[in-house]
Design a protein with these regions (language model features):
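Short, well-ordered beta-strand elements
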Residues: 41-53, 71-77, 144-145
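Short, low-complexity, disordered segments immediately C-terminal to signal peptides
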Residues: 21-44
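A bilobed periplasmic-binding-protein/Venus flytrap-type ligand-binding module shared by bacterial periplasmic
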Residues: 125-136, 241-255, 260
Length: 304
């Protein structure tokens, strides 16, 4: 009987020892699983709105590099300029990157929106295209010209025509002149305003169109080869108001991830992809001494 009791005690001790070992392994597994969950929770997910396929391609590259920072950046592509700011303002987007400071200032003033730029992306030429003439000076009297119908891009198109010597604008018109600010039109240009996305598609029906680069590229035009006049030959003539930027809601200004997104964009890798997908048209707008907040404040004041 004593032998049986002794054996049973030994057996029970062994069972408890095995159970203890099993619990130890389970604890280690649980700990590893907990760490995996914690690591997953540490990654952040955001959505950025862009316009056009070229911008989407550039941001795809940026997003792939941000994965190493624990940031998942989803890209939502829009086909026009109105929706991305509305979506950012209502919280559907976390950031957007499609507009220059002048366009943003016009939106902020018109909608009392609390949006702000946090870093420059690129400066994109506005180009004049024609299937009728090879030199913009050769436009005939009464030539038909199509420009964007929004205030800022339409204003920039008019400034391009002024730079080309085709029209003169009222000095008091500010950074976003309108057709009513034309003070001289010696060639009697017949200027029509349409949605910016439709401008390059009007080329077959007009003597000249003045288009944003993203829409020109999407329409199969090569700004470097096909444009007969661009406004970025001398960047000093363009000004900070036409630098494009990454934009957020002001309430998110302290989000450190957003600064990481800016830093990932403002890189040599981005510049190379940008050059490839825009056929050399878009140029990096960032520098080591940027004051995007200060420059935007000035543009806001000028736009009022």
């Amino acid at each position: 009987m004593n032998k049986k009791v002794k054996f049973s005690a030994t057996l029970l001790a062994s069972i408890f020892a095995l159970a203890a070992c099993g619990n130890g392994e389970s604890t280690e597994s649980d700990s590893a699983a907990s760490n995996q969950v914690a690591n997953t929770e540490e990654s952040s997910e955001y959505t950025i709105g862009v316009v056009g396929s070229a911008a989407h391609d550039v941001w795809d590259d940026v997003a792939s590099r941000l994965e190493d920072e624990g940031i998942q950046l989803n890209i939502e592509e829009f086909s026009e300029y109105t929706t991305p700011n509305n979506a950012l303002a209502d919280g559907s987007l976390d950031l957007n990157a499609f507009q220059h400071l002048a366009f943003l200032a016009d939106y902020v003033n018109a909608n009392d929106a609390d949006l702000q730029p946090i870093g420059y992306t690129f400066i994109s030429p506005m180009g004049a295209y024609s299937d009728v003439v090879e030199n913009i000076d050769d436009l005939a009297d009464g030539a038909s010209v199509v420009i964007p119908n929004d205030v800022t891009n339409g204003g920039r198109a008019l400034q391009l025509l002024s730079l080309a010597g085709l029209i003169e604008l009222d000095d008091a018109a500010g950074i976003s002149p309108t057709v009513s600010d034309i003070t001289a039109n010696d060639k009697n240009l017949d200027i029509t305003e349409v949605d910016a996305a439709q401008v390059p598609r009007s080329l077959a029906d007009a003597d000249l169109v003045v288009s944003n680069t993203n829409y020109a590229v999407d329409a199969g035009l090569n700004p470097s080869d096909d444009a007969i006049f661009v406004d970025t030959d001398n960047l000093d003539d363009v000004g900070a108001q036409y630098k494009n930027a990454i934009v957020i809601r002001a309430e998110d200004a302290e989000n450190e991830d957003f600064q990481k997104i800016v830093e990932a964009y403002q890189s040599e890798e981005t510049a190379e992809v940008m050059d490839e997908v825009t056929l050399g048209a878009d140029k990096p707008a960032w520098s080591d001494n940027d004051d995007v907040a200060g420059e935007f404040a000035k543009v806001l004041e000028q736009a009022n």
